Amino acid sequence: MITTEIKRVKNHINGEWVESTGTEVEAVPNPATGKIIAYVPLSPKEDVEKAVEAAKAAYETWSKVPVPNRSRQLYKYLQLLQENKEELAKIITLENGKTLTDATGEVQRGIEAVELATSAPNLMMGQALPNIASGIDGSIWRYPIGVVAGITPFNFPMMIPLWMFPLAIACGNTFVLKTSERTPLLAERLVELFYEAGFPKGVLNLVQGGKDVVNSILENKDIQAVSFVGSEPVARYVYETGTKHGKRVQALAGAKNHAIVMPDCNLEKTVQGVIGSAFASSGERCMACSVVAVVDEIADEFIDVLVAETKKLKVGDGFHEDNYVGPLIRESHKERVLGYINSGVADGATLLVDGRKIKEEVGEGYFVGATIFDGVNQEMKIWQDEIFAPVLSIVRVKDLEEGIKLTNQSKFANGAVIYTSNGKHAQTFRDNIDAGMIGVNVNVPAPMAFFAFAGNKASFFGDLGTNGTDGVQFYTRKKVVTERWF
């Protein structure tokens, strides 16, 4: 339930809400107003150790619960999430800033991830081949791996945690969750509803905090696997540190997603698609379109319509239904984004829509409006770096081949999109683009939960992505059994 009082956030360990043993706290502001809504503890190593001990103890019994029973328990959780959709969306808007429309969409995507986890009896089925030799049968069995952990970012405080702990727990593991200290309130509510669904204590533990919690998770010998979503430098660190300590790690990292706009595209739908991908959720998502490679033949017409439509977007508090672009997560991030816009201007890009000049309209809060640059090239930082904001760069290319070459020159390879009505163009794009997730006339090619989610190159560190069969493989270990009876 959302209240106006300033909340002091707690950890949840072994089925109970407990104060952190540390003394450091961090203020949590509403990004739309700058007003403090909570204080979150920056928990020390000792809190992580307690959470791991609780999860380790719970694993002894939870791992032996029949898979259909685990699935039924998750159905109860799923029902509670569905019953509380409106409240969950409001919490997201309050602490993250994204519009209520975007938050509602996130809630639904999170629920879909739990729906996947409820199908654990099917997902965990092994394989068998009788009579592999005279009187000998062979089979593969799947088992949980133990205590696992998830480290999640601020930009999807519901969806990304729900990619992780429901599926891991459905597979028989127990879980330690560390969500972003910037969005702790939604994590609290997810855990509350989890235990309302009747799960045994210690199956899910929540430790709030910052880098000390991350390091403690990566170094703890009893944690078998770590799932991470965040920026490229931190993802690289998590992967290298976690694997050095003998853990399985999946680390989903940064992005610089390109969209190629062909002359044969549906212009109206393409413009609206690019706007939605680039500027919804204030551009704070790893699947946002941040570069458009538009073919010269249609470039002027496309840009004219794009700029005109973008200038209609309203910026402001996400609770106001007319607003399309909400605030950025923190003042420090806003200043970073303004620095990138200034660098684009200094490097010679043409600023077609300037999102810096909106303070008079929106007042306090960490707002940057939709921003569009033309004349961008690969030497500019606004093309190279993940800005994580409503900032769109346009690069003009002569044809599809040049657009693909441009896209593949990025160090990131998370998602990529083509807008075209030509099947051959789409096929060429699909076969030659280097990205983990590809869209053809699909604005944000983030797959449904029953498919794996992962990029390539500097967008992903690991072997198995989240969700789908990749997720099941990540959270389980195999035993190959060869048997003969006399």
UniProtKB/Swiss-Prot annotation:
Name of this protein: Malonate-semialdehyde dehydrogenase 1
Catalytic activity, EC: 1.2.1.27
Catalytic activity: 3-oxopropanoate + NAD(+) + CoA + H2O = hydrogencarbonate + acetyl-CoA + NADH + H(+); 2-methyl-3-oxopropanoate + NAD(+) + CoA + H2O = propanoyl-CoA + hydrogencarbonate + NADH + H(+)
Enzyme class, spelled out: oxidoreductase
Presence of keyword Oxidoreductase: yes
PANTHER family documented for this protein: MALONATE-SEMIALDEHYDE DEHYDROGENASE
Keyword Plastid assigned: no
A Pfam family that the UniProt record links to this protein: Aldedh
Entry annotation: catalytic residues: C286
Disulphide bridges: none
Superkingdom per UniProt: Bacteria
Lineage: Bacteria, Bacillati, Bacillota, Bacilli, Bacillales
GO molecular function annotations of the record: malonate-semialdehyde dehydrogenase (acetylating) activity; methylmalonate-semialdehyde dehydrogenase (acylating, NAD) activity
Cited InterPro entries: Ald_DH/histidinol_DH, Ald_DH_C, Ald_DH_CS_CYS, Ald_DH_N, Aldehyde_DH_dom, MeMal-semiAld_DH, MSDH_GmP_bac
NCBIfam families: MMSDH
Protein family: Belongs to the aldehyde dehydrogenase family. IolA subfamily.
CDD domains: ALDH_F6_MMSDH
Pathway(s) annotated for this protein in UniProt: Polyol metabolism; myo-inositol degradation into acetyl-CoA; acetyl-CoA from myo-inositol: step 7/7
GO biological process: inositol catabolic process; thymine catabolic process; valine catabolic process
Residues spanning the membrane: none
Organism: Bacillus anthracis
Keywords: NAD, Oxidoreductase
Subunit structure and binding partners: Homotetramer.
